């Protein structure tokens, strides 16, 4: 069993070290992660400059490879330029903060898993709700249990799984729930400030609150203490709208 691990918080993030600890007993583990935090990078690739790969030599990150690029760069380089045999599983995380609803379109954590999925490799993204790494030990334990369950009871077909873990002590977790993506309200407006020269600068505002957090969604599950397991797919075609768009077809 060979597992490729990546993340978007950077190779020094506690969540990456936790995921490495969780999965190392299950087989050979290769870590390739960004040098810097790339939260919100989505599926971006670095095409304007060459990329470099470095290796950490001490601490909890000893042996980790890190790249001066995005999460997708990391998985792409690992699969096409570093690893001779395709790994059995790509796992991303553990992210600091949830990736639910429309978050999956922006998330570098989910994007790293998507890149593995595009190469035909079962892929799982792990995120811990809320910031600050509280109860990371619980998220670490859940990550190992989910991967162990996948290995003992594989899912059918191509696998792209988005897992969100409540920020709770392990004993307080309510269990696991299979969920669909919820929906958010619009994000908050940008925050306008000025630089020392008086010129305007802008900070992207916070994500919107949950709009659809009904039962069955990832938002609902996590809010009620459950680990949310959401299978994803990449076909964004609106099949219902396709029928009406055909009216625009030329002869």
UniProtKB/Swiss-Prot annotation:
The keyword Transcription regulation does not apply. Gene3D superfamilies: Survival protein SurE-like phosphatase/nucleotidase. Its cofactor is a divalent metal cation. Binds 1 divalent metal cation per subunit. It comes from the Bacteria. It catalyses: a ribonucleoside 5'-phosphate + H2O = a ribonucleoside + phosphate. A divalent metal cation binds at residues 8-9, 39, 95. Keywords: Cytoplasm, Hydrolase, Metal-binding, Nucleotide-binding. Nucleotidase that shows phosphatase activity on nucleoside 5'-monophosphates. Belongs to the SurE nucleotidase family. This is 5'-nucleotidase SurE. It comes from Ralstonia pickettii (strain 12J). The gene is surE.
């Amino acid at each position: 069993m060979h597992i490729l691990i990546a993340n978007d918080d950077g190779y020094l993030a506690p969540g990456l070290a936790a995921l490495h600890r969780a999965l190392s007993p299950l087989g050979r583990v290769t870590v390739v992660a960004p040098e810097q935090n790339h939260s919100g990078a989505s599926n971006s690739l670095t095409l304007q400059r060459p990329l470099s790969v470095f290796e950490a030599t001490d601490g909890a990150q000893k042996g980790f490879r890190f790249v001066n690029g995005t999460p997708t760069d990391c998985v792409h380089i690992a699969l096409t330029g570093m690893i001779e045999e395709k790994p059995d599983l790509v796992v991303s995380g553990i992210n600091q903060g949830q990736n639910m609803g429309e978050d999956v379109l922006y998330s570098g954590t989910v994007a790293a898993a998507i890149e593995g999925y595009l190469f035909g490799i079962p892929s799982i993204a792990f995120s811990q709700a809320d910031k600050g790494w509280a109860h990371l030990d619980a998220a670490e334990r859940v990550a190992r249990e989910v991967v162990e369950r996948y290995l003992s009871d594989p899912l059918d077909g191509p696998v792209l799984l988005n897992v969100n873990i409540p920020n709770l002590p392990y004993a307080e977790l309510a269990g696991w729930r299979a969920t669909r993506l919820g929906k958010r309200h619009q994000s908050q407006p940008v925050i306008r400030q000025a630089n020392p020269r008086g010129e305007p600068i802008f900070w992207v505002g916070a994500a919107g609150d949950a709009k659809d957090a009904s039962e069955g969604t990832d938002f609902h599950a996590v809010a009620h203490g459950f680990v949310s397991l959401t299978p994803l797919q990449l076909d964004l075609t609106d099949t219902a709208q396709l029928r009406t768009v055909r009216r625009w077809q030329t002869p």
